[in-house]
Amino acid sequence: MIRPIVKMPVLLSAPSVDATPLDAAVGQDLLDTLAAHAHECVGLAANMIGVRKRIIVAACAGGAVLMYNPEIIEASGEYQTEESCLSLEGVRPCARYKRIKVAYLDRSFAPREKSFSGFEAQIIQHGIDHCNGVVI
């Protein structure tokens, strides 16, 4: 189901709690909402649709990647950049890493570890910031 986008920083700044298999529908809602906003958005976190759970989706080269409880376990190549966010107005500066390795649960809630680089890594870092209540 396509959900409305939360645009209130006070709601976005609250850290999210771990997702469970009972939150699978939220993951599907994120996928649906990302597809509906594909012309203006490359990633979403659950708090952006009003759910304080650690769930993100990122538009990657092979298709949308859905992650439950993502954690960055390795990072290298810090750089400064600017980002926008569907939930916020304007562009803001932030620090990111060129390469990251993420531990997460996949759509079946099976544990996974995967490395990302470049823009895909940036999208995922932005989503994980949302999970941690960090607003760029």
Descriptions of predicted regions:
Residues 1-136:
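Positively charged
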